Amino acid sequence: MSAIPSENASQSNQYGASSIQILEGLEAVRKRPGMYIGDTSDGTGLHHLVFEVLDNSIDESLAGHCTEIHVTIHSDNSISITDNGRGIPTGIKWDDKHEPKRSAAEIVMTELHAGGKFDQNSYKVSGGLHGVGVSCVNALSKKLKLTVRRDGKQHFMEFERGIPQHRKIELQDGVEISPIKVVGDTDKRGTEVHFWADEEIFNHIEFHYDILAKRIRELSFLNNGVHIRLTDQRTGKEESFAFEGGTRGFVEYINKSKSVLHPNIFQATGERLSEQNTTISVDVSMQWNDTFNEQVLCFTNNIPQRDGGTHLTGLRAAMTRVINKYIEEHDFAKKAKVEISGDDMREGLTCVLSVKVPEPKFSSQTKDKLVSSEVRGPVEEVVAKTLTDYLMERPNDAKIICGKIVEAARAREAARKARELTRRKGVMDGLGLSAKLADCQEKDPALCELYIVEGDSAGGSAKQGRDRKFQAILPLRGKVLNVEKARFEKMLSSEQITTLIATLGTSIGADEFNIDKLRYHRIIIMTDADVDGAHIRTLLLTLLYRQMPLLVERGHVYIAQPPLYKVKHGKDERYLKDDLEEAGYMMQIALNDAALVPTENGTPISGDALSELVRKYNTANAIIKRLSRAIDDAALSAIMTGVTLNLDTTEAAEQSAAALSAEVNDPSVEVSVSSDALSARHLLRIARRHHGNLKVSVIDAEFVHGPDYGVLAEAAATFKGLIGPGAVVRRGSGEKMRESAIADFHQAMGWLRDEAERNVSKQRYKGLGEMNPEQLWETTMDPTVRRLLKVQIEDAIAADQIFTTLMGDDVEPRRAFIELNAL
């Protein structure tokens, strides 16, 4: 354990209360949250809250003070970020104009533009320059808990919608102060921020694991020496991110599922003085692969810029100048009789560009574009020099890269000719609409839907079953061309693809695509639930993702969800989406006329009371099933049978471990008390040995104080002692009554399910062709009852790798992916 820095450290590199500078208040954040964290309706702003706190921990890492970060999505959809950095300063800021004078930690959490990032003695480079990050998170959270471990003490403060709670005013030297509460001693250090997003601000407060994992992966690659752990308590999923290699390792990771053209990754690193006499650090890596797509990721002080900026401009200028010069000197273009453009150089390029800039300037608080003009020159200089040397020293790699660029120029020229030909035929601008298209009457694209269906037979049913006012049907016969393996000119020679392009009306290609001409704002892929249908759906998604990504990004693409079951019970006939819905409906039938007699001569339980028992039982079992991937299911079942857990003290934790072990009663399971390395809180460690393999799971204080544990404990209180001697479950009345003796509630549930199956007929659908037009409308096309899945890309790198794996040339990665993910 490293020494804990004191609040009264020496002036050099001091990070104490005096480092915190206040610039203005927080008032506008809740009124206009979009100005600070982005859109509050589509999830970007919600996840930006996490990134703001995470960036603070990464800044501690950049300053050399943090090596461990733990991000946890709790079962109640709250988020905690814990690090082992220096901890936010906790001393009283005596130059605070506020009365009473507050601790530096409170100021950081409640004042806009307050932080240590404006003083270069505290942080040389930082992503959190604006100083609005963590205070914005506080303002936009219905509740936030701050724990600071610093100077041997553990401090705690709680906020509600940015307002400090339980504040204590003290008098020191005749001055009123409001110190942060000390809750104990500790030998640890660091900051923990645990917040609950405010439903009054955000339309949805459900955090997506993949979005967080994408950002954490980026940070891990860009910051050697920091270990980041991401845990999702809702599903039990957990990953550790500790990548090495910087931008070179990042490029290698992105290209791992692709066929690279040259084994040696180009990397340029260096530092240059800017016009403002500040040091700018540049790290860029590039490698070409055999695909036709450019993938360039830009970062400034670890913050991603999806819109690029001056650093990307410098990179492209250097590439164009150096590569053009090399191609001219070696007559590559002259021999091929083509002219090279910048787009040709970037076809198949994977590039990660990272710069470290003191006081960077961004276009907005979301930092999507770097606008610091002084960055372009250093990037261009570092890349130009290193790329010139790379091409000269590795002639084989240079020849391969230039060959790829020349081939891209040839293909661009061929695509131009093909585009002109198809434009003359009216395909690119939608004039040559297919005769198979059954168009709708509505002319407003925002109200129109296009169903892309598999084959003429399904198309016929869909055409008859649709509402022709706003629903158009386009049947596609056979397999769509796999665009992952095809060049642009080959795509334009495919009848199915040109038909789809003409129908959508947007054209295709980087220069021609125009989303404003989209004729249907809902594009619904409707294929069978069999293997062929899944393949066609994947081919269509590949086409849309690779060639028309804006359709996906703007939420225009959907997948139809036809029902899996048709169930008939007496005169009642209904369609059910999946196995879960079918199980719920069957239990509803089972409870009709059912009664539970818990003991001999006991009072029967029926109606709403029995339904409530079933609901509690099913809810508790669903939690056990969901959490069993993270926590041993025998331990969870023990909680449901009545074991009470308490981890507040060492003695209570040891008693809980003993009780849990006794209830599980399995010699292959060992329950012991442990503690979390960062928070020093007690944990229960459950080790199960099965056929020589050891599986370890953990129960922590967050789980014990969380809603899932509460549901299991409530179920335990309900069912413990409910079923006694002579208990029976029955259904019906009079001569038609049937009953069975039971030993526990689980047995009663099984008997009721079996009874429900007796008078029900079920049909399981395999494809759309099994439905007539009326059924297709009722189940899949009627907007009032249908279910649609919106296609969204949360992790672009992961999506890119999945498309490459599934649709690329390599068989082994595809086989491994299918084996891992097959049901």
For each of these PLM feature ranges, what is it?
Residues S2-L823:
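Conserved phosphate-chemistry cores used by DNA topoisomerases
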